[in-house]
Amino acid sequence: MPSRRWFITLSSATAFSGLFVPSSGRADLVNRNARIMVGFPAGSSPDFVTRLLAEYVKDYAPSIIVDNRPGAGGRLPLDALKGGERDGSLMVLTPGDQVALFPHVYAKLGYDALRDFAPVSTVCMVQFLFVVGPVVPPEVKTVTDFITWCRANPKLASYGSPGEGTRPHFMGVSLARSAGVEMTHVPYKGGPPIVQDLLAGQIAAGVVVVSNVLPHVQAGRVRALATTAPQRASILPDVPTAREAGYPALEGVEWFGLFVPAGTPPEIVAGLNSAVRKALDMDAFKTRLAEQSFEPKGCTPAEFAQLIKSDLEMWAATVKAFGFRPMD
């Protein structure tokens, strides 16, 4: 896949004064309960990060509710955020693909990230693992071994992704093209079903978020052949990077970020950004992210907007190069 700047240069958070201070002495940014929508079910990686963030920015509002709205590839909360309340009480935490990739793979997407949303901050960076299940014999220990096995077993050569037109889908396409091998793509609705079918021997391989498969890798039920990040995962130090394995086509990470509706007052956006950045400075917050192989990463709203623009351009070129036809 085309290379890009994976990590964000941090700058100091914008200060915010003029907080709403209720009689209890709490310094809440908004004087009503807030809601963070997430487009994936409970137990998913975005859900984990959303709930963790809600716990650590609890002084932002009297209470913060996590609203799971799974389905449609994670797009439902973004559809609901468009034109939503602009008082800081409505937010969405989403992976970057729903914002920067989906405009190029869906013909009738109901939102425009640069027009309809106000970016607040990234929260973390997410890496994937290229893993194989028990259908692949134990002597397959590297990506090169897997490619050789695919050539010898074309009917079994398959990989799962969280859905058609997702980043892991394109990672698999990139790997197959660079290696000159055919692999059947099997789309799923998220990472956990991929792992279930890997364990059951229904598919040979998968590209999944580390946290979805980590317990099974550690238990030896599935084997991780490469991580997609530029550096090895600290929690799996023996797993090589895709580049180390000789297949940079598999390289790539994704951000999770927080948004509010376009038109939300700048002082509220700045205050929420400050609350997120404060959480990202807490050792306990960083430790809990690291335990699931998420890398804490914040930025200013302006930096986040620029990242989205860069990703939109990168994915436009990538999707075009793959000849992918936009879906309805």
Regions found by a protein language model. Give the residues of each.
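N-terminal (or domain-start) structured segment
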Residues: 26-114, 156, 164, 181-207, ...
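A ligand-binding cleft/hinge motif common to bilobed small-molecule-binding domains
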Residues: 97-108, 174-178, 205-239
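Hinge/capping helix and adjacent helix->loop/strand transition within the periplasmic-binding protein
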Residues: 83-89, 104-193, 255-288
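An extracytoplasmic/periplasmic, membrane-proximal ligand-sensing/linker region
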Residues: 31-33, 177, 181, 266-328
